[in-house]
Amino acid sequence: MAKKEKLFKLTTVLALCSLAACGGGGGSAVNLETQPLTVTGIAATGAPMANATLQIYGKDGAAVLATPATISTDGSYSATIPATATGPFVFEVDNGSEKVYSVLPSKSSTPVVNVTQISNLIAARLSSTGNPFNLASEIAAASTTVTSTAVTSATTSVMTALQPLATALSLNGTINPLNTTFTANGTGFDRMLDSLDVKIEPKGTKSQIEVTLKQSVNENQDLPQISFAHDATPAALPAVDATKLATSGLTPKIQLLLEKLTSCYADPLSTRITSGGTTAADIQSQNCKDAFIGGNPAGYKSGGMVVSKTQHFGGIFTTDAAAGVSFSDPKFFYSVGTTVANGPTSGDIVFGYRWKDEYGNFNIEKNVGRIDTDGKLKLIGNQYSYDIGVGAYSQRRNYVNQAASTFNSVGYTFGLSCYQLNQFQSAGNKIVKVNVTSPGGRKMTFIPNLSSGNCNYSYFVIAFGKDKTGTATVDGMGDPSFATGTGFVRLQSFYESGDTTATNHPRKLDKNIAFIGGFDGTDLTNEEIEAIPQFGTWTFEYYKTKTAGSTPVATQYFKTTARSLTVDGFKKSVKLPAITADLKTNLIANTSCANNSVYCYVKQATGPFVATWTKPTDPGLMPATYLARVYGMKDVSINSASWVGFEDSIKFGSSRATASIRCGQGESTVQPYCSGTSPSNANFGTNVSIDALDLVSRAPDGTDVSHFHTLKKLQ
């Protein structure tokens, strides 16, 4: 303990009073706990949490501010706790997509309270469940005690773990993250915030915490992190090289880039692009041009995608200025250490942000920028030539006609466009296989699922070395070649009912979806999932031939910004949209079944499929629903080779709760299961069935979650 005190000297700053006020002149002492208290501080996670709201909760768990305070553009705030409120107090800052917490033990404590990812970590250490979201209710229920001593102890343990970073930044050893004075400008203590990513996974009575050091790293390397249970003593970060950290003042540069994009979208559409323009060359607005490296949007490329009406930043060509699109909430992720051929350049900045509009739509995105000759950060993209992407993915697979079979899965989904990589490419340029290696070295193969050269699914699907019957299936290179119908690899799956019987595991009963290890493998344990790095590197190798001995035409890398949750963590921390009761009733009433009543579906009318859903009630925890996807078949004859599986989807703003999905939505040609003369007027053809509706949402950490409603049955 003496060593910790020497390192940090974490002291409570006591309110000083005059002799008269303290009784030296015969007067009575003032009881601060019965007085109003004005509290100030900074709310920032590196960048200011501008325009977020602040609420304070007292000892009884009730909100003490009649009207939530608003965080200023520089992250500062001021709020007055009324005389009637009693501590300890929990501070909650909500920007509409994430909530961050801090604490004040009592009114006699320092009237400065910062709300940052470090204070959120301290709040987690104080919580009996390790979940900052629960802290106020735990205090009210007396299951958690928050005193000055407890706060000091939690702060000391956190700052001891972070000491290597503080030392590298030459920060004063006496710094207290809860009440230190700082400016959210990417320097000093704020640079420390820029360098830290904190993930807290609630799991009932416990929470798992992972702290990642964000810095310069090679494309084929993971970012360093520490992991610990919320009530365990955390290990210290590894030694930190200050030259690898985010450069001083980087976050404001990201913010300036986002402001330039906001100005771009605010320009009238008529002056933003040439009339009818669809490509980067048609962009006329100087605000738009200035957001890209060299003032040239045509220089941008990310996973083979360029700036155009149908690819990246398509809103430049379509969104009216009245929509009020704005870009905010910059987050530095890491910088590229070493240049990669046909990829990013050393020093490129990988960052995240949120866009939103006046209609309540928002989403979380990630991109790559580069410092231009004028010293400003500009968009450049990752410069890779082939589509790439992988993200943690969680799904509730809801069996509409068989509720007892509903199960939850967690794992990863992969962004490999079948159209971009295969169908739309000329002969000789088609990618026929992508081998993917996980951060832990596990290898997976993805291939297109085709019918007559057309993609049955918009993405490459996972391939296995055995088919559903157990027959070995390999290609000319000895790689797996049985094409599933999914790009989602499940690491862990449990029934919603709690049934964990191995013989009843979903992998034994539904062999059309992909589980880690194939049809006869086993799930990963919680400990194995928690060992996966949050910012883990996945390697993608692209092949144009399946000939034995062939080499990949390209090798590319992709880092996640969050690892897969465990099933327990998914259930405890994510709220999902769900189809409306009317739609569910209609689907059940019109269900037909085949193949021993296992394959169930509804006949689709020639018009669009209309999906309707309800949203979770708490927008601060609610992922942004942005995609609806239907799955189905043409010519339903399960034991016949004539049927054609398909998948259609539509993206939309997160404020929506309904979507009409057309046949071949977004395709450039009329698909085999559609009727019509062009994609714009295509309808579902005759004898088409729909068997599933998927509602996909994006969580605040940029990962996707799915509520998949299927009409099929497991048995």
Task: Give names to the regions the model predicted.
Residues Y412-Q423, V602-L621:
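Conserved aromatic anchor
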Residues F540-Y542, N683-D704:
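Beta-strand-rich modules
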Residues G26-K366, T373-Y384:
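Feature for extracytoplasmic/surface-facing segments of secreted or surface-associated proteins
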Residues Y334-V340, D475-P533, T658-T686:
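Signal that preferentially marks extracellular ectodomain short beta-strand elements
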Residues W355-F407, F414, S706-H709:
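Short beta-strand edge/turn micro-motifs at domain boundaries
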Residues Q420-T486, P616-K651, N687-I690:
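Solvent-exposed loop/turn segments flanking beta-strands in beta-repeat/beta-sandwich domains
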Residues S18-A21:
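C-terminal motif of bacterial Sec signal peptides marking the signal peptidase cleavage site
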Residues V112-I118, V390-Y399, Q556-A594:
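Low-complexity, Pro/Ser/Thr- and charge-rich linker/hinge segments at domain boundaries
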